[in-house]
Amino acid sequence: MRPFRCLSGVTAAIIAALGCAALAAAASNLKLDFAKDTVGAEPTALVSVVGIWRIESEKGKNVLAVDGRQWKEGQSSVGIADKARALYGERYAEFLDRVQAYAYYPYVVAKDVPDFNNGEMTVRFEGISGRIDQGAGILFNLKPNGDYLTIRANCLENNLVLWKFEKGKRSSVKWVRDTPTPSRQWHDLKVRIAGAKVEGWLDGKLYLEHTLPEPVSGRVGLWSKADSHVYFDDFTVTPAD
């Protein structure tokens, strides 16, 4: 397993600033189909932290693409310095100074969901290409220090995994094999949260169940890995009643 070192300074800057921008403690409903976004641009409702994320057209419909075809270790998102400056003003430099230029796992963060702790998140995805990976995940429990969890599917491996990213290192929490996920087909991924209980669903089937040591609480987003070129659509975040 390869080591992971997060973009500690800028990532922490972005996450903390997002938290300051949203004072409400409860999670917000979110439904994104990217129809009003501009093809070729980054998504307006998601903050691109690591990797190349942009809107592409697929059969005349806007989708969100993570494009790892020119992936390199240490590839932060385009304009990361400007994003940090916009979020932190004159303080941005101190965060950029802490950046460790090594990022293996692309992800975006939902701007308008300050804290999610109960409910479900869904997204549709299609693996397009990738020789190393074709990973598509829902990121959750994202903390200001950059720690987070993700449940991800992989079109090359046909498995569903709950990963933990903590103190700059990745470790598997729960691993489920034999989850058919063909490339070039759309799939439905769902993560359901109830306190510390986590469920992972793929194409309408419950595959993964796990109880964490502590209840989930943090920001959410979408996740991928390495050279994956994957389409995402219809990302929803629905808090429990």
Tell where the protein language model's regions lie, with residue ranges:
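Boundary at the C-terminal end of the N-terminal hydrophobic targeting segment
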Residues: 24-27
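Short tryptophan-centered beta-strand motifs in secreted/extracellular beta-sheet-rich domains
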Residues: 34, 121-123, 185-194, 198-200
